[in-house]
Amino acid sequence: MGEFKIQSKFKPTGDQPKAIDTLVQSIENGNRGQTLLGVTGSGKTFTMANIIERTQKPTLILAHNKTLAAQLCAEFKEFFPDNIVEYFVSYYDYYQPEAYVPQTDTFIEKDASINDEIDKLRHSATSALLERRDVIIVASVSCIYGLGNPEEYKKLTISLRPGMIKDRDEVIKKLIEIQYERNDIDFARGTFRVRGDNLDIIPSSSSSKGIRIEFFGDEIDRIREFDVLTGNIIGERQHVSITPASHFAASEETLEKSISIIEDELEDRLKVLTAEDKILEAQRLKQRTNYDIEMIREMGYCQGIENYSRILDGRMPGTPPQTLLDYFPEDFLMFIDESHVTLPQVRAMYAGDRSRKTSLVEFGFRLPCAFDNRPLKFSEFESKINQVVFVSATPGEYELDHSEIVAEQIIRPTGLLDPVIEIRPIKGQIDDLYGEIQRTVQRGFRVLITTLTKRMAEDLTKYLKDLNVKATYMHSDIDTLERMKIIRELRLGEVDVLIGINLLREGLDIPEVALVAILDADKEGFLRSETSLIQTIGRAARNSESKVIMYADNITKSMDKSIKETERRRVIQMEYNEEHNITPTTVIKGVRDIIEATKVSEEKENYESEVKKAAKKDIPIEKLIEQYEEEMKEAAKNLQFERAAELRDIIKDLKENSK
């Protein structure tokens, strides 16, 4: 069994050793809650990695959005290259939940576009938890939604070894039961094909590697792993576990029992609706539910099968759903990153889901069991936590009240200080800001500006562009991919000024930023609260020459507290630097593409590992280029132009390196 082992040329420095020791001691003492209060740029991620290495517990890291989860996942993969680091976020590229608007008698059918790549990573995460303990999963709050019963998932997993007495048709029947499809033409993830005595399977947790089961009579003769694209054999396997193609897969016996319970619940609900003289609703419910029952009976699933998950799991009404947290062993460790934002998100999930489902049940679109296909209530989420470390520069009351220990991490390994804060009057703020932008850009640095409204962000961007400033804005209408593209352009200098509302706070790691301007800083509210201001100030703490300008006519309580807290930290940092003879140095970081962590980072990793493998096996670069060119053409044919462009760049690099 693998152990967590950090691979890094760095050693803990500054406040890190003390914070690591304090938190590890607290965890080993059995304390349930602890807080890591770490300023921006103090190396909280590295501290978390060291705690994982010291405690050796399977770990869940909860982030408040996909982008931050992707960034963390990429960093933990670098720290733990020999261990399993997985990415678990919502697999919907687009999601329109089922809903009914009684005022206009409008039923909105569920409409969703599932990202196959992310679905693969979700399966990879759950199957890793069944097989190993050295597993880190970085997840968004979507991990508190129902996922299917882990016991059923484990029970349905097919375990195969060479020498086992297994009939080929028996294995095929089992694969169909766990929702794999036979497809001899379009061989893809979650399908299998049969060629004579060979059975080829692409597991739900992979898309590039397949498993070939070779039979001799009714015995498994050999199991081999192969490259799906080229068909080349990668190696022999002494054991393979094939996990279900869906987290909601169930055995025939479970499905039969479930159908009987669904029919009973339908009968009871029809009596209630008929007694209330809701004839139309009763007819609608009967028709829709009977259709679902037929689909489950014939196919093993139906559209919206998650609405019957409570029945499939054998749970009582009102009991919490099974989630990713239930796939972890009991002694797991959880980190809640940027907890001041993540915890309120967890709290809000249940109420929004419940209000939407009420009208669906009331008007005969769903059975009451649909209420139990839901995210966890906050109290249920708390009950599933074993031990937790809240991580934030500005922890809230909840975190502090539920922590036995608070470890402060104020000193940065780079010696960087919290930025100097200047307060300037609102009158003439735009002209003053333009002058500051010019001076900052001339020095080769970037600027972040926070406004109070989306309109102001757009208007200011237009104004600056008219003055030939390379400016752009970022707000909630911009999707994740585009957002990461903008951040990358900012880091590369294709954009000098980024303007936003509250999107500039948590998790943006941009060392090139030397000026953060906060417009209308004295407009008290959630965008200018103490927490918000400290987080925004933190965006300037990656550069030794950075400063923050607050444009305000009055000093509010929030401003006063955030300025005093920044000054307190700055004094501690300056004293430490003086004592240890440290000169603050700007963080130098490569511009990594972390778009979704499902595409670019994985492709880069695949590319690097392919090149290493090719070197080990003495595969000529020309042969590798040929393989990538085939894959590029295939991607272009399937209209996967981003993938094709990525492969084109890899081919270009390979050609240049081979000269």
From Swiss-Prot:
Subcellular location: Cytoplasm
GO CC, alphabetical: cytoplasm; excinuclease repair complex
Domain Helicase C-terminal: 429-582
Residues in UVR domain copies: 622-657
CDD domains named in the record: DEXHc_UvrB, SF2_C_UvrB
GO terms classed as biological process: nucleotide-excision repair; SOS response
UniProt keyword annotations, A-Z: ATP-binding, Cytoplasm, DNA damage, DNA excision, DNA repair, Excision nuclease, Helicase, Hydrolase, Nucleotide-binding, SOS response
MF annotations from Gene Ontology: ATP binding; ATP hydrolysis activity; DNA binding; excinuclease ABC activity; helicase activity
Domain (Helicase ATP-binding): residue spans on this chain: 25-182
Motif Beta-hairpin positions after renumbering to this chain: 91-114
Binding site for ATP: 38-45
Main localization category: cytoplasm
InterPro entries the UniProt entry points to: Helicase/UvrB_N, Helicase_ATP-bd, Helicase_C-like, P-loop_NTPase, UVR_dom, UVR_dom_sf, UvrB, UvrB_inter
Notes on the domains: The beta-hairpin motif is involved in DNA binding.
Function: The UvrABC repair system catalyzes the recognition and processing of DNA lesions. A damage recognition complex composed of 2 UvrA and 2 UvrB subunits scans DNA for abnormalities. Upon binding of the UvrA(2)B(2) complex to a putative damaged site, the DNA wraps around one UvrB monomer. DNA wrap is dependent on ATP binding by UvrB and probably causes local melting of the DNA helix, facilitating insertion of UvrB beta-hairpin between the DNA strands. Then UvrB probes one DNA strand for the presence of a lesion.
Subunit-level organization: Forms a heterotetramer with UvrA during the search for lesions. Interacts with UvrC in an incision complex.
Similarity comment: family membership: Belongs to the UvrB family.
Protein's name in the database: UvrABC system protein B
